Amino acid sequence: MKYSNITEAKFIDRPNRFIAHVELDGKTETVHVKNTGRCKELLLTNTAVGLVKSDNPDRKTKYDLVSVYKKGIGWINMDSQAPNQVVMEWLKTRSFDYIKPEYVFGDSRIDFYMEKDQTQYLMEVKGCTLEIDGVGYFPDAPTERGVKHLRELTKAVRQGYKCYIAFVIQMEGIDEVRPNEQTHKEFAEALREAETAGVEVLHLTCGVGIDELRILEGNTL
């Protein structure tokens, strides 16, 4: 996926999880942050960020903050909606007979349901923006929703579904995502239980720029 109307600015601060202040053309601009996670290790004062201009003239904020530059890594996409969009693009190239997003299973909505050759698939997607010493980690904040999804996938695989949890790595040069035990031990435990049950973990490497996120060729199911 590629963004249009991208503009580079400098990050100033983040008063709350929904908005940030940036310096754009010498002026302070309030922008919407398309990620409600903490992202404290990314959003540092004077860091370069990528903004997408909204085409809605009635919005209070004119821009969405979608990417941030990290020294030693490059551009990181931090748009929380982007992982599902690029996975949908990618799944369409995988020869499935049927793909349905937002599939209701049990008490949850799982990101994707697919069918191919009489096999039923479920896939939950998680975006990874946290990097420590060359390794990606998820989550960057406690996620009870993430734990719930893993438990649903564990149930599903025992019912005969082929199940995946796909970590979309929203930065270049990283090819592994590990559970962030320190931040959310319960998620790490649920991930291990899911893997033991037969849920497959995908580490989807990406090409990333200030204005794009795409799953690289070579990633397989």
Each predicted region: which residue ranges?
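Conserved catalytic cores of phosphodiester-cleaving nucleases, focusing on short active-site segments
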Residues: 9, 110-140, 153
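Short, charged beta-turn/beta-strand-edge "cap" motif at the junction between a beta-strand
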Residues: 13, 53-58
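Short aromatic-glycine-enriched beta-strand elements
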Residues: 16-21
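Short nucleic-acid-contacting surface segments enriched for D/E, G, S/T with interspersed K/R
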Residues: 37-50
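OB-fold/S1-family single-stranded nucleic acid-binding modules
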Residues: 56-72, 215
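A short acidic/basic microdomain associated with nuclease active sites
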Residues: 90-106
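Nucleic-acid nuclease catalytic cores
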Residues: 134-144, 154-183, 205
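Domain-level recognition of nuclease-like catalytic cores that cleave nucleotide substrates
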Residues: 170-221
